[in-house]
């Protein structure tokens, strides 16, 4: 009777759960939680079981996709180019794309395709402040940068991209302050700084009505969002078929608004995901 039941339960507790068909991963920021949710949903709707591993660091998730402990996640071309390939040049958006895809192939990682949006660094200002100073591009900052203050996330001012921007435009700001990301946006919104290094699909760009400045000298890298798959997952035609529908399906603005729902409006990832699915141009 009861003893048998206890023994039974004890044994049952020792049986490992079967591994999900696919492990979907993501890094620790809103856009990545949304994209991991999207990948998982697409695979689940196709009948696969999925485990999500969220909040993984860049280097960790990249290692995991190479050795197959993770099957799929969304990466950015600029991250692979600068961090994993350690390249300091900027051959432009297409040059980076092809360089990155080729490099990943050698690493046993398959590029399923590009999602359609890019989340790159851009210098941004309050629209009214930019108008007041007559600024629409980084070139317009050259004569006035020495009187302006700039804010960035914790790493931008230490990156090759900033050094390239500084050198190509031959300018520097009077003050350079670093902030936690959300505080960086508040700082520019509240006029504590004139310019920030924004992320182009960040919802706060829309919420605070920031103007993204053009970069005519191509100082800043392209960061196309790309779906990466492990060798094992990529060898399964149905898996590739399912994710192929996501290629070129998400415009920048749709991603920005989905991020805004979470970061500004306080909605759940689920709500943002539903919104995004409604905005997608499915193949």
Regions found by a protein language model. Give the residues of each.
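Ligand-binding "clamshell"
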Residues: 84-112, 190-193, 204-218
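Beta->alpha turn/N-cap motifs
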Residues: 54-58, 68-81, 96, 181, ...
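Accessory recognition modules or surfaces
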Residues: 19-22, 35, 61-72, 76-77
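A bilobed periplasmic-binding-protein/Venus flytrap-type ligand-binding module shared by bacterial periplasmic
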Residues: 120-131, 223-237
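Short, low-complexity disordered leader/linker segments with a strong preference
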Residues: 1-21
């Amino acid at each position: 009777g009861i003893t048998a039941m206890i023994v039974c339960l004890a044994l049952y507790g020792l049986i490992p759960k079967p591994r999900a068909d696919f492990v979907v991963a993501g890094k620790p920021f809103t856009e990545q939680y949304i994209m991991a949710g999207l990948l998982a949903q697409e695979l689940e709707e196709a009948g696969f079981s999925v485990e999500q591993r969220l909040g993984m660091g860049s280097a960790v998730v990249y290692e995991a996709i190479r050795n197959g402990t993770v099957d799929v996640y969304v990466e950015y071309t600029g991250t692979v180019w600068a961090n994993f390939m350690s390249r300091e040049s900027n051959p432009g958006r297409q040059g980076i794309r092809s360089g990155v895809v080729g490099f990943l192939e050698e690493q046993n990682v398959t590029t399923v395709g590009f999602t359609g949006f890019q989340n790159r660094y851009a210098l941004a200002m309050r629209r009214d402040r930019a108008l007041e100073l007559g600024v629409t591009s980084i070139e317009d900052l050259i004569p006035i940068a020495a009187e302006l203050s700039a804010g960035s996330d914790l790493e931008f001012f230490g990156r090759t991209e900033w050094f390239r921007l500084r050198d190509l435009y031959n300018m520097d700001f009077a003050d350079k302050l670093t902030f936690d990301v959300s505080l960086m946006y508040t700082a520019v919104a509240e006029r504590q700084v004139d310019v920030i290094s924004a992320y182009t699909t960040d919802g706060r760009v829309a919420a605070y009505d920031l103007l993204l400045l053009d970069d005519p000298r191509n100082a800043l890298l392209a960061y196309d969002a790309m779906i990466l798959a492990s060798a094992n997952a990529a060898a399964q035609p149905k898996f590739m078929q399912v994710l192929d529908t996501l290629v070129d399906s998400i415009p920048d603005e749709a991603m920005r608004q989905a991020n805004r729902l979470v970061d500004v409006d306080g909605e759940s990832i689920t709500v943002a995901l539903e919104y995004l699915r409604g905005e997608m141009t499915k193949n």
